[in-house]
UniProtKB/Swiss-Prot annotation:
Principal location: cytoplasm
One Gene Ontology biological process: mismatch repair
Family matches, as NCBIfam families: PRK00015.1-3
CDD domains linked: RNase_HII_bacteria_HII_like (cd07182)
PROSITE patterns: RNASE_H_2
Organism this protein belongs to: Rhodopseudomonas palustris (strain TIE-1)
GO CC, alphabetical: cytoplasm; ribonuclease H2 complex
Entry keyword set: Cytoplasm, Endonuclease, Hydrolase, Manganese, Metal-binding, Nuclease
Domain of life: Bacteria
Occurrences of domain RNase H type-2 (ranges): 73-261
Record protein name field: Ribonuclease HII
Entry note: cofactor: Manganese or magnesium. Binds 1 divalent metal ion per monomer in the absence of substrate. May bind a second metal ion after substrate binding.
Length: 281
């Protein structure tokens, strides 16, 4: 018979002695199940409502400082933005942070509000070396999104004022750079230099998509930044694709097929942008 180990186990009383003396009455003992150390440790947390709470530490500058102590400098972090949208370029950024002026609040750009990203963008550009490279939709169509992204990331590293001796890149793919390159999965949430690059890439691309929204009204680029949300798909079906849409995505390809005799237009393969920051009092 299988017992529920959570229920107390009652031990029956011993039978009365057959000797001439009086039988002693033994009260049944109650044995409580033992609580394991793990269960005991988990109990207070559960009682306080902390069960399932995971603390996420912000990116740090520790790995950069470890390399600096070994005499390795400059050290860059690089990341990209815009792999998944239906429209617009993929934007890569490389950043060399000043060890004495690492901005506070750095984090993966996806975990920050737009206002926080904008503020950090200004601070990073004012205190660090920054480069930004845009890979056009035409290059994405020709090479595929992965190759276009790696190409832009590599160009961003080589476009820095001083070629770094070591590069941290977000993801699993190392770059074909002239310096040592270390790929770090989830690096934008671990390494400060990569987090800074993710912010520069994200804000640069968002600003560009807002400019494209002025050139292509009706698509809502300023809202969804080219991602395949229902509003964008609806506009694509009504208005057709633009020169900024990526042809290999199924919704865009279907939209082109509806336009008889109209070949997809070609656009500039690459354009690089210098990050400019207006001086603030």
């Amino acid at each position: 018979m299988i017992r529920d180990t959570k229920q107390p186990i009652k031990v029956p009383a011993k039978p009365a002695s057959r000797s001439g003396g009086k039988a002693k009455t033994v009260k049944p003992k109650t044995i409580k199940p033992k609580t394991s150390a793990k269960a005991a440790a988990a109990k207070p947390a559960s009682a306080k409502g902390l069960k399932g709470v995971i603390a996420v530490a912000p990116p740090s500058f520790r790995r950069e400082r470890a390399l600096i102590k070994r005499g390795i400098w400059p050290i860059a972090g690089c990341d990209e933005a815009g792999r998944g949208p239906l429209a617009g370029p993929v934007v890569a950024a490389a950043v060399v942070l000043d060890p004495k002026r690492v901005p506070k609040g750095l984090d993966d750009s996806k975990r920050l509000s737009a206002e926080k990203r904008e503020a950090l963008f200004e601070e990073i550009c004012a205190t660090a070396q920054v480069s930004v490279v845009y890979a056009s939709p035409e290059r994405i169509n020709r090479d595929n999104i992965l190759r276009a992204s790696l190409w832009a990331l590599t160009r961003a590293v080589h476009a820095l004022p001083d070629l770094p001796r070591h590069v941290f890149v977000d993801g699993r793919d190392r770059l074909a750079t002239k310096c040592d390159c270390e790929a770090v999965i989830g690096g934008d949430g671990l390494i400060a230099s990569i987090a800074a690059a993710s912010i520069i890439a994200k804000v640069s691309r968002d600003r560009l998509m807002c400019k494209l929204a002025e050139q292509c009204p009706g698509y809502g680029f300023e809202q969804h930044k080219g991602y395949g949300v229902p509003e964008h798909l609806d506009a694509l079906a009504r208005l057709g694709p633009t020169v900024h849409h990526r042809r290999f995505f199924a919704p865009v390809a279907a939209a082109w097929q509806k336009i008889e005799g109209a070949p997809p237009p070609q656009i500039r393969d690459l354009f690089e942008a210098d990050v400019t920051v207006e001086a603030t009092a």
